[in-house]
């Protein structure tokens, strides 16, 4: 495993490598990606207070819905949501009562600062929508385009305060992220590899390695969408700062042969075989035809319990909704984050492996983490103009 100390410290900037981001108008056919919220134990409550964060408070202790997209969007659909009623809480873990004063267990619940979040929601409701020019797209989304930042064996969500405790992760966004990062740090140390600069969030995924050489393969494009997954957006609310989310299952270890869900696919500027023109020797990885390269899409939940920024297993505070709405246990509908990730890899006979499953050498353990931190007014503006009005916006939050 790579030495975790080779990444940047939280108080030092590092240079980032160049990146090519797929632009609007790129035709990418829809790809079905099956994800489930990951259950990972062993995290601790934050060791630092998030006083600098406008929302974050102190710790007190499936099948995804999908985006509706079109060929004009550089993103791909993650599948069709179920029409059945949303389920209740995704697991049986019970949240404590706010202000109970009970000692915080490891991997505990982190309460949202209700006063700060209500202030943000009030400002969101009072905000007027901007006029919409003609010719604007109708995909209800805004986005951030991010470059690779650094690689560390850290995870401030699952293993906060424990440097080197995680498998290797590749980080984009906030440059200061390490095992000790808190919500307050994200607002204090705001240097980022993402555009817009008002997105101070941190995003990370397990590092991809070439099986033949054991060399890491880093992302060449990392677009983060915030979008509506449903036909209507009238009940959407802005995301609270400090929200932690995980999508995918780091413990899943099954083959990913041609046609399997939850695998890497081949994409480029035009039609082509998503499964590649050939497969690796173990069949788990595509070999892309020219000029296609590896891509992966990961869909996060769009329903929140309205109380907690994190939970013991990092999934009980969020849930997937559908066209019938959010489950009663998670009544607050928020924009759904989608990772649209591009790699320079084209595939080899030896194949690849993820840091989350180096022995299995399949893609099934792919997962992603999001530690949300935006300028509150910038978040409100984008949710109101782009998602609520169901209009497509660029990195700067303008209609396009």
List each model region and its residues:
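N-terminal export/membrane-targeting signals
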Residues: 1, 25-28, 36-40
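Primary mode marks residue(s) on the alpha4-beta5-alpha5 output face of response regulator receiver
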Residues: 94-166, 170-298, 305-400
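A ubiquitous, low-specificity "background" feature that marks scattered single residues
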Residues: 13-14, 38, 52, 173, ...
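N-terminal low-complexity, Pro/Thr-rich disordered segments
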Residues: 34-134, 393, 400
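Terminal targeting segments of Actinobacterial cell-envelope proteins
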Residues: 1-19
């Amino acid at each position: 495993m790579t030495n975790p100390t080779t990444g940047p410290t939280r108080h030092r900037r590092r240079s980032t490598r160049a990146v090519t981001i797929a632009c609007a108008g790129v035709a990418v056919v829809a790809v079905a990606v099956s994800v489930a919220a990951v259950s990972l134990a062993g995290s601790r409550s934050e060791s630092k207070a998030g006083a600098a964060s406008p929302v974050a408070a102190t710790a007190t202790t499936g099948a995804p819905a999908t985006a509706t997209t079109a060929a004009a969007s550089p993103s791909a659909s993650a599948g069709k949501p179920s029409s059945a009623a949303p389920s209740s809480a995704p697991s049986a873990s019970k949240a404590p009562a706010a202000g109970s004063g009970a000692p915080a267990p490891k991997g505990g619940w982190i309460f949202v600062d209700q006063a700060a979040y209500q202030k943000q929601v009030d400002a969101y409701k009072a905000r007027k929508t901007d006029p919409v020019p003609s010719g604007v797209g109708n995909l209800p989304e805004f986005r951030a385009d991010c470059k690779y930042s650094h690689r560390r064996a850290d995870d401030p969500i699952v293993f906060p305060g424990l440097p080197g405790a995680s498998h290797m992760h590749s980080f984009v966004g906030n440059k200061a992220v390490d095992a000790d990062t808190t919500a307050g740090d994200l607002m204090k140390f705001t240097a980022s590899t993402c555009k817009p600069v008002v997105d101070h969030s941190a995003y990370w995924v397990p590092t991809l390695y070439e099986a033949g050489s054991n060399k890491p393969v880093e992302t060449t494009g990392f677009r983060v969408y915030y979008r509506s997954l449903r036909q209507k957006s009238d009940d959407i609310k802005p995301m609270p700062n400090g929200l932690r989310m995980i999508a995918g299952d780091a413990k899943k270890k099954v083959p990913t042969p041609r046609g399997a869900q939850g695998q890497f696919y081949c994409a480029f500027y035009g039609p082509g075989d998503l499964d590649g023109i050939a497969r690796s020797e173990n069949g788990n990885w595509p070999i892309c035809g020219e000029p296609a390269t590896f891509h992966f899409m990961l869909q996060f939940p769009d329903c929140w319990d309205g109380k907690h920024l994190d939970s013991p297993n990092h999934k009980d505070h969020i849930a997937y909704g559908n066209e019938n709405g959010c489950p009663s246990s998670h009544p607050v509908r928020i924009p759904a984050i989608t990772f649209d990730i591009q790699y320079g890899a084209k595939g080899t006979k030896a194949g690849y492996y993820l840091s989350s499953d180096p022995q299995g050498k399949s893609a099934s353990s792919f997962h992603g983490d999001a530690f949300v931190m935006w300028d509150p007014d910038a978040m409100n503006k984008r949710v109101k103009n782009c998602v609520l009005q169901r209009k497509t916006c660029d990195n700067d939050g303008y209609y396009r």
